[in-house]
Amino acid sequence: NRFEQNFLRSLSRTFDVIGTDISETATDYENSVQWDFHNVNPAWSGNQDFVYTNSLDQSWQPHVAVETWLSQLKENGILIIEHTHAHGPSGASEMDPFGVKPTVMPYVLTMWFGSQISISHSVAKKSNMDKDSWLFVLKKNQHSVSLIKSDALV
């Protein structure tokens, strides 16, 4: 419904906001492009101050999606992932296959990216829905050291 895209555009005229959608109707909306968020767009790589998404639950390859979004960020850029309890296991479906509770999301992200990212979050109600919305803010760390090997505990 483009609520978030319009809201972010209303915050400032100093940055551009575009929306992406995989559907063919994406270009029917102002400032929207048709794009699969799993795919890297070389023009966007390393050029974005922030990436916002509320679509991670719709991903068949959520790790790839987050990796792609992180690759689009400038140095000191942030990735904002909106997630609700409706995106958890009980809300998972063919259209929304990634069913992870928001309370588990930091652990999942840490398993995927380890010390490559820093994570913070906040919980609030959005003005267009009457349920808690979790905002996870991810930032790529400049120098990261992995303390855990994937095949064994150290």
Regions found by a protein language model. Give the residues of each.
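Conserved Class I S-adenosyl-L-methionine
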Residues: 86, 90-121
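A short SAM/SAH-binding and catalytic strip from SAM-dependent methyltransferases
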Residues: 48-63
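Conserved beta-strand signature within the Rossmann-like core of class I S-adenosyl-L-methionine
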Residues: 75-88
